[in-house]
């Protein structure tokens, strides 16, 4: 294995990142590029787990506007993450990266059910594992899923790959030209400064299990590899 900072990672991809400029659905050139970026890191010998969101297919707010019950809207969102996971699996395997999808909601015809020990074994056998379906329960975000699964598989770090966002700022840099980018933070810093990075449940899980996470721009080629190799890009948030 190459000289790297993190040997087992949890990569969190937003659904919107797969849509690219289209804003909705899956953009084939974009998901192909994401798969190639993952392969570049995989070739270093890194064990890679992935959680992908579903915002490119379904937003909970859309359900709320329709008067839909929150739990029902969340279940639709979970199915959206599974569609994204299968598409990403197909793109990864088409370029020679062995990949398994595990879902928190059983659908054995298309994916394995989530089993922690089996997921870890896949990683040890040099297979990428994509966790889909969220936690399997409504009211929990895919950020929380990433933090939970990262703790369960003993990941070294969570890589928060953002669509066009290169780190954490003191304010929205698009609205405030005086916004300052942070290179290093702690979870308590995020809470005390009121920074909107991930939901409080995900943040608490990361802090309680002392799992660092790195927020960086997915759209810049090679960034996933740079984070894994320890290059100082984006914002690193320490668990404690």
Curated annotation (Swiss-Prot):
| Naturally occurring in which organism (per UniProt) | Levilactobacillus brevis (strain ATCC 367 / BCRC 12310 / CIP 105137 / JCM 1170 / LMG 11437 / NCIMB 947 / NCTC 947) (Lactobacillus brevis)
GO MF annotation terms: ATP binding; UMP kinase activity
Regulation of this protein's activity per its record: Allosterically activated by GTP. Inhibited by UTP.
User: Pathway it acts in?
Assistant: Pyrimidine metabolism; CTP biosynthesis via de novo pathway; UDP from UMP (UMPK route): step 1/1
Task of the protein: Catalyzes the reversible phosphorylation of UMP to UDP.
Which Gene3D superfamilies does the protein's record reference? Acetylglutamate kinase-like
Name of protein: Uridylate kinase
Q: Which interval of the chain is the signal sequence?
A: none
* NCBIfam families reported for this sequence: pyrH_bact
Identify its protein family. Answer: Belongs to the UMP kinase family.
One Gene Ontology term of the biological-process aspect is:
UDP biosynthetic process
Chief localisation class = cytoplasm
GO cellular component assignments:
cytoplasm
């Amino acid at each position: 294995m190459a000289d790297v900072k993190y040997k087992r990672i949890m990569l969190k991809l937003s659904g919107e990142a797969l849509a690219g400029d289209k804003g909705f659905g899956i953009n084939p050139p974009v998901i192909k590029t994401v798969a190639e970026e993952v392969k570049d890191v995989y070739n270093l010998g890194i064990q890679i787990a992935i959680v992908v969101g579903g915002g490119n297919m379904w937003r909970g707010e859309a359900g709320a506007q329709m008067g839909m019950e929150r739990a029902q809207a969340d279940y639709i969102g979970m199915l959206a993450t599974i569609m994204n996971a299968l598409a990403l699996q197909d793109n990864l395997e088409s370029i020679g990266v062995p990949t398994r999808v595990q879902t928190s909601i059983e659908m054995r015809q298309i994916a394995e059910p989530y089993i922690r020990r089996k997921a870890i074994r896949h990683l040890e056998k040099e297979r990428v594992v994509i966790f889909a379906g969220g936690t399997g329960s409504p009211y929990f975000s895919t950020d929380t899923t990433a933090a939970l699964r990262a703790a369960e598989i003993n990941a070294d770090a969570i890589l928060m790959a953002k669509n066009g966002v290169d780190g954490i700022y003191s304010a929205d840099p698009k609205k405030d030209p005086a916004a300052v980018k942070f290179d290093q933070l702690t979870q308590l810093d995020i809470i005390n400064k009121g920074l909107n990075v991930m939901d409080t449940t995900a943040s608490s899980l990361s802090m309680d299990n002392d799992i660092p996470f790195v927020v960086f721009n997915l759209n810049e080629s090679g960034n996933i590899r740079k984070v894994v190799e320890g290059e100082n890009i984006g914002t690193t948030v320490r668990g404690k």
